Amino acid sequence: MTIEKIFTPQDDAFYAVITHAAGPQGALPLTPQMLMESPSGNLFGMTQNAGMGWDANKLTGKEVLIIGTQGGIRAGDGRPIALGYHTGHWEIGMQMQAAAKEITRNGGIPFAAFVSDPCDGRSQGTHGMFDSLPYRNDAAIVFRRLIRSLPTRRAVIGVATCDKGLPATMIALAAMHDLPTILVPGGATLPPTVGEDAGKVQTIGARFANHELSLQEAAELGCRACASPGGGCQFLGTAGTSQVVAEALGLALPHSALAPSGQAVWLEIARQSARAVSELDSRGITTRDILSDKAIENAMVIHAAFGGSTNLLLHIPAIAHAAGCTIPDVEHWTRINRKVPRLVSVLPNGPDYHPTVRAFLAGGVPEVMLHLRDLGLLHLDAMTVTGQTVGENLEWWQASERRARFRQCLREQDGVEPDDVILPPEKAKAKGLTSTVCFPTGNIAPEGSVIKATAIDPSVVGEDGVYHHTGRVRVFVSEAQAIKAIKREEIVQGDIMVVIGGGPSGTGMEETYQLTSALKHISWGKTVSLITDARFSGVSTGACFGHVSPEALAGGPIGKLRDNDIIEIAVDRLTLTGSVNFIGTADNPLTPEEGARELARRQTHPDLHAHDFLPDDTRLWAALQSVSGGTWKGCIYDTDKIIEVINAGKKALGI
């Protein structure tokens, strides 16, 4: 292309440049006290507000900042001018607008700022996944900086939907200890009337490669899986789980998680949230009053009852850290999961695969909380953004018209009984729902691992509730190698796939959903186990062990495994105990203790290395989170610890 094709000829209007303007009409509502005592920035802020078109006579209202993860550019009729990364952030500008109008209607002044977010589905199996988890930390930092950069704000509303943008928003709000804050969940997209959900459809490549899907079927299913333009995926993955956790923390209004994006109830939630945060400000209730150790534990309880994503084992600790609360450890998670029953039957865990919009209609978080209240598993005195406690909110919910009408809507519209989506405890037990998360250890994972035990296919679990698998190892030093082996039909029934180098130092702790989803939706996949130092998408199911620690690149035993080694796995879904052990080879069987000694003698896999395309930004994140406590502390930045380590290093180096 020549420069002439870039700078095309223009008409006279192009050259008619105006060099001055009359400026806004009126005068700033200044007082002598303001001129004498206010910082110049506050005064100039009023000038900027008038310059952007706000009525100069209405510049003394309560300023409320709305932060959001909106992406893309929508035309007035909703058509895309420029696409976003995903449906989850495509429509939330409508919620932000609804909240802003409500603030204005009540005499306030709304401000808005944006930090958009990536799509973990879009980046699965690509180098984009290397930025996924580090993005959460970066976005939380930018959000906090934006909040502090508007020093006149009286309250903050966060609007977000998906896997990393929503946790980042919650972490940012949690750090605003002395401000009223509230979270507006971005809701859920609808499932297609005929077709597949956004989780299963991500396996069209693997199923086509294994001759289980035609090209035409793949093309049609892929086209319609996101059946409405806004909202998070239809399953209870990391996005959906983060929404219910926000509500459980008391940071979002009751019955606000998982609402169908773009619909009247979804918009009204934004307006209600604007009214609520203004009331919090009037009453002097701040984030510090809401995010307590009790709130954190309520969130862990709801996570277990919903059967939530294992990624929240990274996000809830990070929220707790930002809020100044106690960071939950493995023992705390185990204690919660052993006593809290899973009550929700939705995608991807089942046993009935309802989309999350049905969980919303069945009553969502407050309906689950009613059952947990009766079991004595909640802190009912925890404060929430309604200005009332959890217990008071539940009293309202139980007798509300909202509850009755939405549950009836589910019966009439879909022919589904609400208690088949959110099950009473006895019914859940009778249907075989088991507790959510387990932390197996062993000579491969001496510092632990994570499995969503409730999501192991029941057909491969014994009558005693224990999953046993002893099989030969297939070692892969990258996810790309592993998915290629699946597509080339090189994995056979009974294999144990081990993917190493996927921890923080290798890939930024990438998600490996294309592996777990392929194993779920290929007919023989349930007979294969997966072990990795990477993590999993919230929609992952099956005998998949992630977060293996220490990671391979830190010298962890997982990095010393070789093809044709034998691994023995046991996971008790009832007691939530488990083990993952190397037990030698077919020719040289070993006990777990002998296996540990053998692994200690071995060298790390010769092909193991950090990914060639790992960004420097992610390498820095990996180093900072490592000295801050690593994955078991939520991959946080502990500033004091980081400074301590840097100073010690400078001293040792004589800098």
Curated annotation (Swiss-Prot):
NCBIfam families: yjhG_yagF (TIGR03432)
Organism field: Escherichia coli (strain K12)
Pfam families on file: ILV_EDD_C, ILVD_EDD_N
Effect of disrupting the coding gene: Disruption mutant has reduced ability to catabolize D-xylonic acid. YjhG-yagF double mutant cannot use D-xylonate as the sole source of carbon.
Listed GO biological process terms: aldonic acid catabolic process
KW Transmembrane (keyword) present: no
Matching InterPro entries: Dehydratase_YjhG/YagF, Dihydro-acid_dehy_C, DiOHA_6PGluconate_deHydtase_CS, ILV_EDD_C, ILV_EDD_N, IlvD/EDD_N
Protein name from the UniProt record: D-xylonate dehydratase YagF
Inducing stimuli: Expression is repressed by the transcriptional regulator XynR.
Cellular component terms (Gene Ontology): cytosol
Enzyme Commission number(s): 4.2.1.82
Alphabetized UniProt keyword annotations: Lyase
Catalytic activity line of the entry: D-xylonate = 2-dehydro-3-deoxy-D-arabinonate + H2O
GO MF annotations in UniProt: hydro-lyase activity; xylonate dehydratase activity
Highest taxon listed in the record's lineage: Bacteria
Family matches, as Gene3D superfamilies: IlvD/EDD C-terminal domain-like (3.50.30.80)
Gene name of this polypeptide: yagF
Biological function: Catalyzes the dehydration of D-xylonic acid to form 2-dehydro-3-deoxy-D-pentonate.
Protein family: Belongs to the IlvD/Edd family.
